[in-house]
Amino acid sequence: MTELGDDPDVEALAAARREEALATNQRRLLVLAGDRDAGIDAAFDAVRGADVPDDEVTFVTAREGFRFHRVEPKRASSLLGTTRTLVVLDAHEEFSANALGRVAGAVDGGGLLVLLTPSLDDWPTRRDSFDERLAVPPFSVADVTGRFRGRLVSTLRDHPGVALVDLDSGTVERDGAYRQGISFDAAPPRVPTEKDRRSPRRAYEDCLTADQSEALAALEALTEPGTAVVVEADRGRGKSSAAGLAAGSLAAEGKDVVVTAPGERNAAEVFARAERLLSELGALRGGGAGDFDIAADRGGRVRYVPPTEAGDAAADADALVVDEAAALPVGLLESFLAAPAVAFCTTVRGYEGAGRGFTVRFRDRLDDADREVTDARLDDPIRYAAGDPVESWTFRALLLDARPPVDQLVADATPETVSYRALSPDDLLADEHLLREAFGLLVLAHYRTEPDDLARLLDAPNLTLRALTHEGRVVSVALLAREGGLDPDTRRQMYDGGRIRGNMLPDVFTSQLRDEGAGVPVGYRVMRIATHHAVRSSGLGSRLLTELRDEFADDADYLGVGFGATPELLSFWRDNGYGTVHLSTTRNDTSGEYSALMTRPLSSAGRDLRDRHANWFLGRVGDVLGDALSDLDADVARAALAAVDSFLSPDLSEYEWRVVVGASYGPGLYTTAPGAFRRLGLAHLTNPERASLTPREERLVVRKVLQTHPWDAVADELDFHSTAGAMRALGDAYEPLVDEYGTDAAREERERFR
């Protein structure tokens, strides 16, 4: 520790670290800990010592009045894709892990990241607006812990390349010198000979590294139908730029290229690079990157289409480029295979989050598709040299490099060999390997895991983590959120439309489904559940859910879950004792899926909650399927209805039975009394074991009777030769339903046609 007296020479320290950063083309981190006003003054000294022009400096702070470019912490995402020489992050008031990751990603090689913090000894005990967001009802901010900040502080104190000044004591705790670090400049790009490339020479000349030029070469496979290219990279490696160069090259040849991503912002770099290349080639004819629609010579085009529409749009295009593919669900990724040629580009580890799930969740399906698959990976950073200590610190501090155990260590795990255990935040902090394995599995359980998720896991009072371990290695995890147990004022606020954080199921039950008592029972919602990919489909997920049921039987009224509905997931949760109580009436913007809510009672209060919502669901679902859910996938509807823990009686009048019998066994028409067919169809679909219908017949009931699709559309979708054939098939499908549910009057009517 170096004594600096009453006036620490931050200027000299910043100058030294800046000189080192420039010499290695890496970044350095300077922490100014202590009084906030003193920290801001010291940050100005750091800017002066680093000799950075004002227009290359950004302050990320809630404070105003600086001569530098300023960004509010809640808008830190605006720095993604930008490059700054020096960024100051004020962590005193509105600090979040997400903001830290996004800010760090904006610092260029040779630059400095300056972090203003409270005293490092006191910081973990401080609470700010982020902690207030973690304090979801019925908890208060006093229940939020400071474990995440405590872990962050420990990394600041021992990671290479981090200079640390204690402003309160006037000392340099660490000077951050990192001269022993090895810096490697990326290999220069390679330009293939004309006979070895399809893309223009200029596209290769625009590449910045050999990795990028090799990725562009791999993307040339998109010129041929029946191909797929997978491009993976950590953030900052030029993946999106390579995709943009490929898209621009295709457009210059007159190709129609569809680009999709979770949002337009995610695809901005693809369009910027495509526009620049087309301009350099003299082939730009209209539109632009800002419009996300670029016109080129010979009818070429690069255009953005939202993920839920991209599969259909790409089927008529020449190629589809998917950026940030890991942030999209498997169902959408599969729909993209309708394109003649498709590129899946994804960030494996990035400052804004991690997305390794693409490889685990989708790669097997891609390999099984009738595609010639080309792989490319970019490892060399674009904006700074390899071995950058700020990158390695950020990955470590935010667990962006967390991974599950290697396959060999868990491949022989079975439900009989595993142990169930609670993973408390203190357990996780005491064992870095345990933390990395558990968090690594949680990353794979979701399309996009943010740095804030780590802070929530360690500090949020409503979250709890459970796991199955095999010989000490984590093979399955479940993250649960405690919900409900709300006081009357909170329940009334929710009923009146107020949004209550962290209580998803009670919120939907109360505000949307008008059940003011739904916030009284205590439930645990399974937010994420994941099993190691090496031992999937071996019963471990079900074993974990059984353990959860047994553990929480005396502490909660129900277990619940909400997810993007697919037939497979609905069946999985049904097999584990969960019943459908609601289907959302709007699709998720990113996944294109409708959400299903399911519960499993643990007490009489939980059973009452389940029973009334199951019955209300059955009372409305027939109408909703013919309206807001008229485009719900038929197999999702079948699985959702089969999972309802209640049976619907058809309750037909004698006249209605005569109509149904006449349409199934005789010459009658379905259109005479569609309501009777709807009730009988719902009775079967909520208890499909009672009568034997084929999956195709059940889809016919869903599409025509429940969703009222036109006959010609139904016949086409279900591969009937004609509408008349579909009509006859519907009558045939109702024969076993008449046999199973029919009254004496129905059976008597049936005998007239035998």
UniProtKB/Swiss-Prot annotation:
- Top-level class of the enzyme under EC nomenclature: transferase
Q: Keywords, A to Z? A: Acyltransferase, ATP-binding, Cytoplasm, Nucleotide-binding, RNA-binding, Transferase, tRNA processing, tRNA-binding
Ranges for region Disordered: 181-202
This chain belongs to the protein called tRNA(Met) cytidine acetyltransferase TmcA
- NCBIfam families named in the record: RNAactase_tcmA_Halo (NF041296)
- InterPro entries linked to this entry: Acyl_CoA_acyltransferase, GNAT_dom, NAT10/TcmA_helicase, P-loop_NTPase, TmcA/NAT10/Kre33, TmcA_N, tRNA_acetyltr_TmcA, tRNA_Cytidine_AcTrnsfr
Task: Enumerate the catalysed reactions.
Answer: cytidine(34) in elongator tRNA(Met) + acetyl-CoA + ATP + H2O = N(4)-acetylcytidine(34) in elongator tRNA(Met) + ADP + phosphate + CoA + H(+)
Null mutant phenotype: Mutants lack the ac(4)C modification, but do not show any growth defects.
* The keyword NADP belongs to this UniProt entry's keyword annotation: no
Please give one Gene Ontology molecular function term for this protein: 18S rRNA cytidine N-acetyltransferase activity
Family affiliation:
Belongs to the RNA cytidine acetyltransferase family. TmcA subfamily.
Which positions make up the signal peptide?
A: none
Which Enzyme Commission numbers does its entry carry? 2.3.1.193
Q: Name one GO cellular component term.
A: cytoplasm
Q: Where does ATP bind?
A: Q212, G236, R237, G238, K239, S240, S241, A242, A243, G244, L245, R383
